[in-house]
């Protein structure tokens, strides 16, 4: 019996143009060619989706877990002009306002009642209420990435934007962030008190780097600030009140494009991710149960003049994101048309959540809650990672974790493929492997010494695997 020859090829990759966590990492949004969707971050669940016609979106930015979203048009056929910000009320399913500028919008940051818009050389801030009111405007250096970050905790005031000189950061203090509205029964805990007024006026400019900035990040409180530059090797942590350098952390030795930095909500750790396909975790607080790696020559630096490199702190944990080929490809993929949109298969966004630990020592005391990471890739991968040392972040609780999120619209769950251990990156047997895999292997050999891997607790898919996009 003769059978016709069949070829096995990978499925068409999901085209996700942008992924955004809300400030508290309770939900995230995903923009695709078909529209956008809102998901619960953990447990992963599709909450609602909007299939749009007439163009594509570059970004959908959520305002906490409210129904208000900020839309930016983009792609090869933008739904909205790139110089507009659309305020979309998803409860109404329609646009409620728009902001128009004379140039393309580069970035957005928001908190309750406020929206900051980054343009090429300035940042404009608006107050949101019954009407949208222009609050102020600040000049910056050339800012093609649209960098800005805003503190979102109750009573926080900090907005950070690029300075007028390359590598500098401006610290702007807005009116205090209001507390979230209470929709259910009153909480049992006392309301958060505003912090005491600083003894002296806080700094307004930090000379963070000598090269162009690539990321700006702040924790919810706004007490700290993280900066990275185009060199992509160092992460600097600053005190936002005094402007002093608190820590200097080293991602690696090879030049890389750092995509983002995220503070743990209690500011005891940070995570960093880049185009190397690796998520690095650093400890910030002493006595946190985890310590960053250091050179064996580090203890000698107070006594012997050694190069600064030998005093560097390296991540204590990391996780290498498997390439798309490790999931869905076992042969050469079909050729792509020249006009097809291309998504970086290893570009990702990372956020912190709190989840029950898999290591329960005393079942009678209730679930042990720990900080974990959620990694979202632009090809629709959802990873839940636990840290190698979780004792510092674990707390006992008898109350189940819940998020203030509306009920789901879609009843079809995503495909689940849970795993209990990290899976090594596959760099052979597929033409989907990244063009810089060799450099990543070198980084893994150098930076992987004495480091520990995060544990992959759960892997799932979002996007087209939910039946949309």
Regions found by a protein language model. Give the residues of each.
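Beta-strand-rich domains and repeat architectures in extracellular enzymes and scaffolds
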Residues: 5-35, 54-67
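Canonical WD40 repeat/beta-propeller blade segments in eukaryotic WD-repeat proteins
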Residues: 13-20, 55-61, 103-109, 141-152, ...
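Conserved loop/turn motif of beta-propeller repeat scaffolds
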Residues: 24-25, 65-66, 112-114, 154-156, ...
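Beta-propeller domains
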Residues: 24-53, 74-89
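Hydrophobic beta-strand positions that form the internal "hydrophobic ladder"
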Residues: 28, 69, 115, 159, ...
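Terminal intrinsically disordered, low-complexity extensions flanking WD-repeat/beta-propeller proteins
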Residues: 35, 56-57, 62, 139-144, ...
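Per-blade loop-tip surfaces of WD-repeat and WD-like beta-propellers in eukaryotic adaptors/scaffolds
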Residues: 40-47, 86-94, 125-138, 164-204, ...
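Asp-box/WD-like beta-propeller blade repeats and closely related beta-sheet repeat scaffolds
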Residues: 92-153
